[in-house]
């Protein structure tokens, strides 16, 4: 779905790509979602002590599939976020395909929970992560080769949603509308009585 606002949560296994996404997001008017205290506390329960403790949520380079899925499940529930960008960089302990398989299963089973959240992924690494990208695409998750591009797309989607909302909004009538209508009616009646057209 399109984002309902401009607040994005970024989850990554590497700090640098999270910063790239953050810079692109903020440069175009988006903002990092401020994670709720409950979200931070839930992440603290299972992430290593040296995780980022803020958005972007850096779950560290040794993140296995279970850590990824549990972290995604927690941040996806955060009420302060309009979207989620999951970033993966291949590292020695990373299995991009297995992580994508588990995320695909989670996304497919959690649709009611995620119905108002925009989900994007950046699976960095080219051919090495291709199989994982395909799995995420099959689950309806758009994937991008670079995190800054994903953040830009989130912003574009947010602007589009905002503009659509404006198009369908019924404008309010000014309070002096009744007086103007009366004046217009009297002018038209006067013109008709005088025989002018």
Annotate each PLM feature.
Residues 91-95, 126-127:
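Short, small-residue-enriched loops and turns at beta-alpha junctions
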Residues 41-42, 92, 152-153:
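Short secondary-structure capping/turn micro-motifs that flank functional sites
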């Amino acid at each position: 779905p399109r984002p309902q606002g401009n607040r994005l949560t970024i989850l990554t296994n590497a700090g640098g790509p999270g910063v790239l996404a953050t810079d692109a997001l903020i440069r175009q008017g988006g903002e990092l979602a401020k994670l709720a205290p409950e979200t931070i506390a839930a992440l603290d329960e299972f992430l290593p002590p040296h995780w980022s403790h803020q958005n972007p949520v850096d779950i560290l380079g040794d993140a296995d599939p279970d850590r990824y899925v549990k972290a995604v499940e927690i941040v996806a529930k955060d009420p302060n976020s309009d979207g989620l960008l999951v970033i993966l960089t291949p590292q020695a302990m990373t299995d991009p395909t297995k992580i994508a398989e588990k995320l695909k299963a989670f996304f497919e089973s959690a649709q009611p929970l995620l119905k108002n959240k925009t989900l994007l992924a950046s699976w960095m690494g080219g051919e090495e992560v291709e199989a994982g990208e395909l799995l995420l695409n099959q689950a309806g998750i758009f994937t991008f080769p670079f995190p800054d591009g994903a953040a830009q797309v989130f912003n574009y989607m947010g602007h589009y949603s905002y503009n659509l909302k404006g198009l369908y909004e019924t404008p309010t009538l000014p309070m002096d509308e009744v007086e103007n209508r009366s004046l217009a009616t009297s002018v038209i009646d006067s013109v008709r009585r005088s025989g002018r057209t």
